[in-house]
Amino acid sequence: APYADLIWMETGNPDLGMAREFAQGIHAKFPGKMLAYNCSPSFNWAKYMDVKAMTTFREDLAAMGYKFQFITLAGFHANNTVMFELSKAYMDRGMAGYSELQQREFALESSGFQAIKHQSFVGTGYFDAVQQVCQQGQSSTTALAGSTETEQFH
């Protein structure tokens, strides 16, 4: 502990009691030592906690000194779930299935979601600018200006 910036706690299920005991033990000898907790996707969260407990789990850990809380493979699970749902929707309803996903993206835009404008989101404007510099402003193959994205999503 004296040589670590952060100490990682691992449990076999979401267990605030064990997390508290660990934190108290570390902080008794190393006050203020930052702690990390893996909110593992391998846990069946609903098996161990009700919704209320899950809702405050993050704050409960933070109060114990767990400054770094993370869900390993959260993106993996989210991407695979959405791709499964999209594939099924596309199989069942064709392009209407995809459009339903797109409409969800539009609805999320007011909350800060930006990926609906995927060309600008991934930096196409930057690469267009680099291409224009390299071509002395004479490039005819830039991607963003005059694109369907610019026309339909801005």
Task: Annotate the PLM regions.
Residues 94-145:
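Flexible C-terminal active-site loop/helix
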Residues 34-42, 63-68, 93-109:
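Short, basic, helix/turn surface patches
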Residues 80-96:
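C-terminal helical cap(s) of enzyme catalytic domains, especially alpha/beta-barrels
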Residues 1-34, 41-43, 51-70, 84, ...:
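Alpha/beta enzyme core
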Residues 77-80, 124:
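Low-complexity, intrinsically disordered regions enriched in charged/polar residues
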